[in-house]
Design a protein with these regions (language model features):
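Residue-level recognition of the GNAT/N-acetyltransferase active site
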Residues: 7, 76, 80, 109
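Conserved beta-strand-loop-alpha-helix junction that forms the acyl-donor binding cleft
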Residues: 106-116
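Conserved acetyl-CoA-binding loop-helix of GNAT-fold acetyltransferases
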Residues: 75, 81-94, 121
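Acetyl-CoA-dependent GNAT
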Residues: 5-72, 89, 95, 99, ...
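Extreme N-terminal starter segment of soluble prokaryotic enzymes
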Residues: 1-2
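Short acidic, glycine/proline-enriched helix-loop-strand junctions
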Residues: 114-131
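Conserved GNAT acetyl-CoA-binding A-motif
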Residues: 96-108
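Helix N-cap/coil-helix junction residues
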Residues: 84-85, 101, 125
C-alpha cells in the first residue's frame, strides 16, 4: 500500500468511489472546482491510498489553524479490513500535528453504520454529546 497526497487529477476516480460508497453523501461541494479549492487551501493534507496502483481509499483533510476536519474517509470494498482506514487516519493526524493542529473533528452521518462503528472503535476519539452542529448553505436571508 502507498499513501500519497490527493491531486486534482484524482477527482474523477474519487467521485466514482464516493458515489458507490453506502453511507457517504456526495454534495455540490464535491464537484471539481470546490474540490480543487479545498486541496489548494489544505496542501498535501488530503490522502489517497493505492494498492498495486489501484485506488483503494481516501481521506479529505483540512484545518482552520486550530482544529482539523476529516471528511470522506472511504476504503473501497475489496480493500476493507486490511488497516487502510487506520493508516490513512494515522498519516492525516501526523500531517496535521506537524502543522501544530492536534485536535480534530469528523462528522459522520447517523445512517452510516459502518462509518459509525469505525469511529466508535478508534482509541482517543469520542462522540460529542455537548454540542449540536448547525449548517447553512450561505443563502439564508
Amino acid at each position: 500500500m502507498q499513501i500519497r497526497a490527493i491531486s486534482p487529477a484524482d477527482h474523477a476516480a474519487l467521485l466514482d468511489l464516493w458515489r458507490r460508497t453506502p453511507g457517504l453523501c456526495v454534495r455540490a461541494e464535491d464537484a471539481y472546482e470546490p474540490f480543487c479549492r479545498y486541496l489548494a487551501r489544505n496542501p498535501e493534507l488530503s490522502l489517497l491510498a493505492e494498492v498495486d496502483g489501484q485506488l483503494a481509499g481516501c481521506l479529505l483533510v483540512g484545518h482552520d489553524g486550530r482544529r482539523g476536519y476529516l471528511q470522506h474517509l472511504v476504503v473501497d470494498m475489496p480493500w476493507r479490513g486490511r488497516g487502510l482506514a487506520r493508516a490513512l487516519l494515522d498519516e492525516a493526524l501526523s500531517r496535521l500535528a506537524a502543522l501544530g493542529v492536534r485536535k480534530s473533528h469528523v462528522f459522520v452521518l447517523r445512517d452510516a453504520p459502518v462509518a459509525l462503528a469505525f469511529w466508535q472503535a478508534q482509541r482517543g476519539w469520542g462522540e460529542r454529546r455537548d454540542i449540536q452542529v448547525f449548517s447553512t448553505q450561505g443563502d439564508a436571508g
